[in-house]
Amino acid sequence: MDKKISILAFGGSLRKGSYNKALLRAAQEMVPKDAQMEVFDIAGIPAFNQDLENNPPQIVKEFKAKIKAADAILIATPEYNYSIPGFLKNAIDSASRPYGDNAFDGKPVAFMGASIG
């Protein structure tokens, strides 16, 4: 049997009733049989600190390892003040550091979002 395509997904909202978390759950149900999608909760990733980038907290190590192991990345995020939420930017910064060890290198990344408006 061929290896399934691995998709790592995460959301850009901390809100319990997040529309974007619901969007990820819906996307997970629509994943084709030749793929699998894991949703990673980035809420516990601490503020990026460059002094710790060579030995980051365990959750950052786990996040980076999952990104590196995935074939593709899916991010569902709301728009806050014409941009992405700060904690999502923080998670992306944490996974792309230190220089030369960017977990996203070579990964296709898709963004999607949902809102009531």
Language model segments and positions:
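Short hydrophobic segments within beta-strands
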Residues: 10-11, 40, 112
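N-terminal beta1-alpha1 ligand-phosphate binding loop
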Residues: 2-34
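Short glycine-/acidic-enriched loop or helix-start segments at secondary-structure transitions
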Residues: 19-21, 49, 84-86
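Helix-loop-strand module that forms the ligand-binding subsite of alpha/beta enzymes
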Residues: 56-117
